[in-house]
Amino acid sequence: MLFIISDDLTYTTLSCYGNTVCHTPNIDRLAETGTLFTKAYCQGTYCGPSRASFMTGYYPHAINAMGYKNPRPEIGNRATWSQHFKNNGYYTARVSKIFHMGVPGGIEEGGHGADDEASWTERFNSPGPEWKAPGTGETLEGNPDGIVPVKGGNTFVVVEADGDDMVHSDGKTAAKAAELIRQPRDKPFFIGVGFVRPHVPFVAPREYYEDFLP
């Protein structure tokens, strides 16, 4: 089983849901051959509670997961989604952000964040430069004249970064996931792959901006 999640991606930005500006060909191909949900709702309005909810199967308020923390102290020895597979003979791996992980801070540090160790056979993090990536950028908040330089933190900044995908967290995540899928093994797998974009900061290789520049 391959589970893929992106961070802060609203359905209204996807071509398969009618967006005519954004280009999402890979997601569109999945939609063409799978199920396209029109009434699926998030149980938590922000990152930590939402992820804790779908990984444990509980409402956020039922396990006191209202912040950015690991739900394990509240669920005790009850199995998470991936842990259920692990307990039944599956190889389970996490690549980057599945449970909560700070963006951009946690990605810059390359740590495990609020991950649940018991849920996985192996865990792989994908550190990246985030807003510090070399390139051209500016801060979008409170900057009507476009003169405020890029600054750190959980802020709306945009960086047209030098280099290719492998400079950044998501490029590393995709490469590691592909490597794990191709590895021969004697048991089935559950691989959770977490991409951190389009969560702020808006950092991507320069080539992805070209179609949208004036």
Predicted regions and their residues:
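Formylglycine-dependent sulfatase
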Residues: M1-P214
